[in-house]
Amino acid sequence: MDLGLAGRRALVTGAGKGIGRSTVLALKAAGAQVVAVSRTREDLDDLVRECPGVEPVCVDLADWEATEQALSNVGPVDLLVNNAAVALLQPFLEVTKEACDTSFNVNLRAVIQVSQIVAKGMIARGVPGAIVNVSSQASQRALTNHTVYCSTKGALDMLTKMMALELGPHKIRVNAVNPTVVMTPMGRTNWSDPHKAKAMLDRIPLGKFAEVENVVDTILFLLSNRSGMTTGSTLPVDGGFLAT
């Protein structure tokens, strides 16, 4: 199925690894031009070697001023994927100020800032656009030691709805994808303990974790005109976890 992404220009944050990297590769394969944002230069260099033509931008999205400078002249963007995130896991009684600041700065504040930059450009050009925020099932279910992470993703879901409300009149659609555990290299490492994995898998009706392509396919669908009447949604990619 042709998603009609050829010739469009996309920006993907957290593009160096995992879901972000795979999203960049899928967008390029679909004929889109892609700006890849990561804080890790080595990851960007490796991505460009694998996929020539990707436009790399190296910046720490937790730094508001640096992000403003790095993206102020990024050029026209039609599609945005806010994927960058951190997960700093601590028991509630041990949550630190540093974990709060870092998590909210990257997982929420940076989404606001990058989306403002991109949406203002869309509005100035008078063109429609699509934004996808990568959220999590943790936005809607409490998970042990995920106090700050769950809170940032819950806020991201509401931000998605607010953006959809206020950007809709400008023909900009905004949606979120909410995956379960995803089998990125980090996901495989973090959930390699069979006892830990079983506790989560027992809550997933399909009995398995998500593969990266499950999430990427959903992102591309939400970016495409095939989802032209969909905005303000938080779409689970969770094997039924949120249905239980």
From Swiss-Prot:
A GO cellular component annotation in the UniProt record: brush border
Species annotation: Mus musculus
InterPro entries found in the cross-reference section: L-xylulose/Carbonyl_redctase, NAD(P)-bd_dom_sf, Sc_DH/Rdtase_CS, SDR_fam
Modified residues (N-acetylmethionine): 1
Active site, UniProt feature: 149, 153
GO molecular function ontology, one term from the record: L-xylulose reductase (NADPH) activity
Keyword set, alphabetical order: Acetylation, Carbohydrate metabolism, Cell membrane, Glucose metabolism, Membrane, Methylation, NADP, Oxidoreductase, Xylose metabolism
Tissue specificity: Highly expressed in kidney, liver and epididymis. Expressed at intermediate level in lung. Weakly or not expressed in brain, heart, spleen and testis.
Positions contributing to NADP(+) binding: 11-39
Name recorded for this polypeptide: L-xylulose reductase
